From Swiss-Prot:
Keyword hit for Nucleotide-binding: no
Protein name, UniProt field: 1-(5-phosphoribosyl)-5-[(5-phosphoribosylamino)methylideneamino] imidazole-4-carboxamide isomerase
Organism: Caulobacter vibrioides (strain ATCC 19089 / CIP 103742 / CB 15)
GO molecular-function term, one example from the UniProt record: 1-(5-phosphoribosyl)-5-[(5-phosphoribosylamino)methylideneamino]imidazole-4-carboxamide isomerase activity
Subcellular location: Cytoplasm
E.C. number(s) listed in UniProt: 5.3.1.16
Keyword field: Amino-acid biosynthesis, Cytoplasm, Histidine biosynthesis, Isomerase
Catalytic activity field: 1-(5-phospho-beta-D-ribosyl)-5-[(5-phospho-beta-D-ribosylamino)methylideneamino]imidazole-4-carboxamide = 5-[(5-phospho-1-deoxy-D-ribulos-1-ylimino)methylamino]-1-(5-phospho-beta-D-ribosyl)imidazole-4-carboxamide
Length: 241
């Protein structure tokens, strides 16, 4: 299982939100590039970056901060937040992003996502952000009428690298990962699934790995790393077991 430490960008700073609420942002580092380097030193092999302002505005906003991250580290980066055009995808891949995450556009224009996956094989992920059983859009400010499985099945055989499923009710709350919800999606599709939201302790990683059924491909670690409820070394050992 691959672990993805998360850097969420708001106004150029590294923050964590509670349940995706932009008004409940805690600044953990004013230098995202410095934070990225720390995660590399901790031994992580990937980095998960989200442009929070971009997710709400529908276009990349924290461009300078992302570029500084890309310049400061050599491990691969997956980036999401406000990327809703093929031109936007291309620009970030040319800038050095290894995997682009598409969320809102996956709901509104699935054909664009499929075309992106054809143009950039294994470099497109789909964000499946779930609240009250439905997929959220526009930086989690709106709800679609699609379930996680409904959305994900649109992209079977499309060449999408991963599905990133986030339980919004648990995001930033350190309440434990929704193993059942993650597992249900993983068993329903053939696309690798990455769990996000609520991973609070090494035990959550162990629970994801121990479940019966399709293997969970990865997990995103956010507040747990910043708050110290998970030690990177212990998390990486658990993920590799």
């Amino acid at each position: 299982m691959i672990l993805y430490p998360a850097i969420d960008l708001k106004d150029g700073q590294c923050v964590r939100l509670l349940h995706g609420d932009m008004d409940k942002a805690t600044v953990f580092n004013t230098s995202p590039a410095d934070q990225a380097q720390r995660f590399v030193q901790d031994g992580f092999s990937w980095l998960h970056v989200v442009d929070l302002n971009g997710a709400i505005e529908g276009k990349s906003v924290n461009t300078a901060a992302v570029e500084q991250i890309l310049e400061s580290i050599s491990i691969p980066v997956q980036l999401g937040g406000g990327i809703r055009t093929l031109e936007g995808v291309e620009a970030w891949i040319e800038a050095g992003v290894s995997r682009v995450i598409l969320g809102t556009v996956a709901v509104h224009d699935p054909e664009l996502v499929k075309k992106a996956a054809r143009l950039w094989p294994e470099q497109i992920a789909v964000a499946v952000d779930v609240r009250d059983g439905k997929v959220a859009v526009d930086g989690w400010t709106g709800l679609s009428d699609l379930s996680a499985i409904d959305l994900s099945r649109r992209f079977e055989d499309a060449g999408v690298a991963a599905l990133i499923i986030t339980d919004i009710s648990r995001d930033g709350a350190l309440t434990g990962v929704n193993v059942e919800g993650v597992g249900e999606l993983a068993d329903a599709v053939s696309i690798p699934v990455i769990a996000s939201g609520g991973v609070a302790a090494v035990a959550d990683i162990e629970r994801l790995k121990a479940r019966q059924g399709v293997e969970i491909a990865g997990a995103i670690l956010g507040r747990s790393l910043y708050a110290g409820t998970i030690k990177p070394s212990e998390a990486l050992i658990a993920a590799a077991a």
